[in-house]
Structures are given as structure tokens and as C-alpha cells.
Amino acid sequence: MTYTTFSKNKNNQLYEPMFFGQSVNISRYDQQKYEIFEKLIEKQLSFFWRPEEVDLSRDYIDFQNLPQHEKHIFVSNLKYQTLLDSIQGRSPNIALLPIVSLPELETWIETWSFSETIHSRSYTHIIRNIINTPSLIFDDIIDNKNIANRAKDIAKYYDDLIELTSYWHLFGEGKHTINGKKIKIDLHELKKKLYLCLISVNALEAIRFYVSFACSFAFAEREKMEGNAKIIRLIARDEALHLTSTQHILNILHNDKNNEGMSDISKECYEECYHLFIRVSDQEKIWAKYLFQNGSMLGLNQEILSQYIEYITNIRMKAIGLPSPFKILSNPIPWINSWLISDNVQVAPQEISVSSYLIGQINSEINDSDFEKFKL
């Protein structure tokens, strides 16, 4: 099936599946097959924020006074989050847009990816405000084995889908020899690649960020690195929306009544999906061990974080129809909910700047040239 950015075939988009139907031609929103994506778009747009709105001048002082093992925890999490959102800032567009068939879903994917680029910019904003040589941090991301090992697992499902989709668009279904390699291209296998990719993305949004989130909020609970925590809180709000979107996509695919042609695929991939979540959970526990290898921080340690990972893994798997693999039933760090559920938080403005408002709109930098027009 040859891909075109604008199909001249007139069609009724209400009868198209989410994926692998006719590519979107007219981006129209007066009629929608799945209104949830329009609601997600509107919500994400209402969330719009910029990292520069948050003043990090106090965080610089806080960071200098952290013990070395806490600096390791803080910086390592920023490195990992930078990697995750570097992938998420581009991959949904590259992997999903060429096969999407609904305008509301197409626009949601673009809106989602754009918000991820704001997250990437945020980590740069944080790093260059607390560290004199930011390149030392960014240059280590690729070289750090603890980060790189997880990157392979994250990118694999995207890459597999992108590769097979490219072949499908160029050569169509059938058996082909490409660069001396025999490849079978069929829609069933392509749908399977898509489904596993969506499960992988869901696991990423559902679990992979939350060790870093917990650490950032634990610092702020001690009134340390509070500017960073305000930014991470905004990121966490976005990620919760992205998680909701992937859960909706998957549950729509699961429902036979929607005629998406994917319910058999979900059953076929059931075991692999279950073990994918377990693997992600195990990787995050290993990451927690790496973070706390030189010491714990007040209110948080490797054991507590591992329990929290199991707790949220149970919830996330249940949300998409998978059984809960762990026995833990209660949240071992309930205080984190006040950071993740923004409506729970009321902050006195005189005590600390409020992250629910646009802040830092005034440029606080003053140079000698700013006083040239002043007369005494």
C-alpha cells in the first residue's frame, strides 16, 4: 500500500479504523468516530506551559548543598528522563502517523508528541540552571550503560513497527527480498507490531517515569529542589494524560464492537504483553538499585521504590485488561498523590510560587546596560 500525504479518494472517515485504513486526507473535526481524542487534544492544549516560567535560582543553591549520593540520584534521573522524552518527542509521529486513519487520532498523536518536546526542553532548562557545564551531563546519556540498556528495550518496538511499515508502503504485502534478506510482509504481522508497540508505549508512560517522579517529589518534601519539582509536576500531569490516551487506544482495539480488527491480535499477544510489563517493572527496580547504590534519601529508598513500582504496575496492567502480577495492594508512598493529583494541592503563594499559574514571566536578569536611561 503506497503512502500518500493526501489521498484523493473520497471516504467517510466515520467508517475507517484507527489504523491501516485510508490515510487521512481532510483534517475535519465536525464529525468524529471517537470523541475521546478530541477531549484529549483540548485538555493537552489547556495544559500548555513553558519550562522557562519556573524560576530555578534557588535550586542552584540547593543542588550545591546536596550530599554526593543525592546529587547522583538527582542527575541520573534527569539523564534518564531526557532519554525517555527524546524518544517520545519523535517516535509516536514517525511510527504512528503513516498508518493512522482518523483525523482526531492523527491530531492527538501530533499534540502528544509536541508536548513531549516541551518535557525534553524542561530537562535542559533544569540542567543548565544547576550545573555549570551541561554538556557533561548530556554527553554521558549515551555512554551510561544503565540508561542505554533500557533504551534498547524502549526503541525496539518502535523500530520494528517503523521498519515493517516502510516495507509495506514501498512493496505491499507478499514475500520480498530486500538487501539480500527475505522478508514476508502481511497485514496481520504489521498489526501485531503495532499492538506490541502500543503496549510498550503504554508501559513507558505508565511505569518508567515514576521512579524519577518519586525522587523529585521526595526532594521537594524536604523543601529542596522545589523549582525542579514544580516542573516535574507539570510533566507528570502531561504524562498522566498520555497514559490515558494509550489506555483508550488499547481498550478500543480490544472491543470487538468497534470493528477495529485487532481483538484477535490482542489475544495472540497476551502472554508477550504480560511479560513485557513484568520486564519493565524489573528494569525500573534495577534502576532504583542503581540510584541508591551509594545511599538513600529521607523518605525514600530502594525497597520502598521497588514496592511502589509493583503497586503501580498492578494498576496499569489491570487498566488494559491484564492480570495483576504482584501481591502489594496499598501505595507505600501515599504522599506522592498530592503531587500527582494537582487538585489535592493548595499552596500559600507567600510561601512558595504556585505551579498551577504561569510564573517567572518577568525577566529577572539585570545588566549594566539596563541602567543607562536612569537619571538620579
From Swiss-Prot:
Residues recorded as binding Fe cation 1, renumbered to this chain, are: D85, E116, H119
Determine the domain of life of the protein's source.
Bacteria
Recorded GO MF terms: metal ion binding; ribonucleoside-diphosphate reductase activity, thioredoxin disulfide as acceptor
Q: What is its EC number?
A: 1.17.4.1
Q: Does the keyword Oxidoreductase apply?
A: yes
Query: Which reaction is recorded as catalysed by this protein?
Result: a 2'-deoxyribonucleoside 5'-diphosphate + [thioredoxin]-disulfide + H2O = a ribonucleoside 5'-diphosphate + [thioredoxin]-dithiol
Q: Where is Fe cation 2 annotated to bind?
A: E116, E205, E239, H242
Q: Which Pfam families match?
A: Ribonuc_red_sm
Provide the cofactor note recorded for this chain's UniProt entry: Binds 2 iron ions per subunit.
Q: Where is the active site?
A: Y123
> Which keywords appear in this protein's UniProt record, sorted alphabetically?
Deoxyribonucleotide synthesis, Iron, Metal-binding, Oxidoreductase
Q: Which GO terms describe its biological process?
A: deoxyribonucleotide biosynthetic process
SUPFAM superfamilies cross-referenced by the UniProt entry: Ferritin-like (SSF47240)
PROSITE patterns, A to Z: RIBORED_SMALL
Spell out the family assignment given in the record's similarity comment. Belongs to the ribonucleoside diphosphate reductase small chain family.
User: What is its quaternary makeup?
Assistant: Tetramer of two alpha and two beta subunits.
Tell me the PANTHER family matching this sequence: RIBONUCLEOSIDE-DIPHOSPHATE REDUCTASE SMALL CHAIN, RIBONUCLEOSIDE-DIPHOSPHATE REDUCTASE SUBUNIT M2
Q: What does this protein do?
A: Provides the precursors necessary for DNA synthesis. Catalyzes the biosynthesis of deoxyribonucleotides from the corresponding ribonucleotides.
The name on file for this protein is Ribonucleoside-diphosphate reductase subunit beta
Gene responsible for this protein: nrdB
